[in-house]
Amino acid sequence: MHVKTGDEVLVIAGKDKGRRGKIKRALPAVNRVVVEGLNIVKRHQKPRGPGRPGGIVEMEAPIHVSNVMLICPSCGRASRTGKRFLEETDHKGRPRKVRYCKACDAIIDK
């Protein structure tokens, strides 16, 4: 996936198109992400014991990863990302793979 937990993204399709948010949780098995404060749905929940009453609960639903675009931390624009290998190596001795912004060519990963 081109986004990770903690990235700031722009929603490019759907009912929240044009809104920004931070990724709360990534679900790579189903190619979806949960974005803070976006894609709010109402869930009718049954009571679950004495401490958890039932009712209509608002929660954030997952959005498909193709409907979000990463906002580059260096240039501040929503842009496509790519991956490249650096000269330095990771802990296993392999070249380190990082994401970069295709608009400004800055490395996104630390």
UniProtKB/Swiss-Prot annotation:
Protein name per its UniProtKB record: Large ribosomal subunit protein uL24
InterPro entries documented for this protein: KOW, Rib_uL2_dom2, Ribosomal_uL24, Ribosomal_uL24_CS, Ribosomal_uL24_KOW, Translation_prot_SH3-like_sf
Name of encoding gene: rplX
SMART domains named among the record's database cross-references: KOW
Top-level lineage group: Bacteria
Entry's family note: Belongs to the universal ribosomal protein uL24 family.
Subunit structure, as described in the record: Part of the 50S ribosomal subunit.
Alphabetized GO MF terms: rRNA binding; structural constituent of ribosome
Any GO BP: translation
Species: Chloroflexus aggregans (strain MD-66 / DSM 9485)
